[in-house]
């Protein structure tokens, strides 16, 4: 019974109308703000969720459980001012199928949380230019969004890909506000609210990271 339920990939909990080639669940636009930001790994112990937002700019293993057991965390996340959609990794050296699956999981959880009253802020992620075919599917236009710059300036190619994706995000989504986790590159445009990064993503790349 347990194994059978796991094989549903959460489709037994909710089915959402999808968009784009891969049927990505749609996230509604948000205009939420947070007085302070903490990583999901500190959310359970947070004593004042009403003045905090939760981000997922962490190593994936620290939050994979929100996908494995989504109902366990809904009530907790609903207490926070805002919750970013989970930043499942889209490394350029990941197989394309894995990248698309991670984008899908991010959106399924965002739509599921919104359905249950969580104040969701879309996290925008991309890898290389080929990912532009699907990585903005399901994202709202004119919304507050969250982006992480952590690890994107480690070399020229990573910096180039981050800029290409950022500018494509501006063109397609026209975000109202951009919550930028990490250093803000001097070329970045838009209504940016910087958030200092206390956790960094550490990973030994197979080829290159974004």
Predicted regions: what is each one?
Residues 1-92, 108:
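SEC14/CRAL-TRIO lipid-binding/transfer domains and related phosphoinositide-recognition modules
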């Amino acid at each position: 019974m347990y194994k059978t339920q796991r094989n549903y990939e959460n489709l037994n909990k909710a089915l959402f109308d999808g968009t784009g080639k891969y049927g990505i669940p749609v996230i509604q636009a948000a205009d939420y703000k947070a007085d302070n930001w903490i990583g999901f790994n500190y959310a359970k112990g947070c004593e004042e969720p009403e003045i905090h937002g939760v981000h997922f700019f962490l190593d994936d293993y620290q939050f994979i459980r929100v996908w494995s057991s989504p109902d366990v965390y809904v009530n907790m996340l609903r207490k926070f001012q805002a919750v970013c959609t989970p930043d499942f990794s889209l490394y350029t050296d990941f197989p394309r199928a894995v990248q698309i699956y991670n984008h899908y999981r991010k959106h399924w959880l965002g739509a599921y949380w919104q359905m249950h009253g969580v104040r969701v802020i879309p996290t925008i992620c991309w890898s290389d230019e080929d990912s532009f075919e699907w990585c903005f599917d399901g994202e709202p236009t004119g919304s507050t969004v969250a982006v992480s710059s952590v690890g994107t300036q480690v070399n020229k190619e990573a910096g180039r890909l981050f800029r290409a994706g950022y500018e494509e995000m501006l063109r397609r989504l026209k975000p109202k506000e951009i919550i930028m986790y990490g250093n803000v590159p001097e070329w970045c445009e838009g209504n940016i609210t910087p958030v200092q990064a206390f956790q960094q993503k550490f990973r030994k790349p197979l080829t290159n990271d974004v």
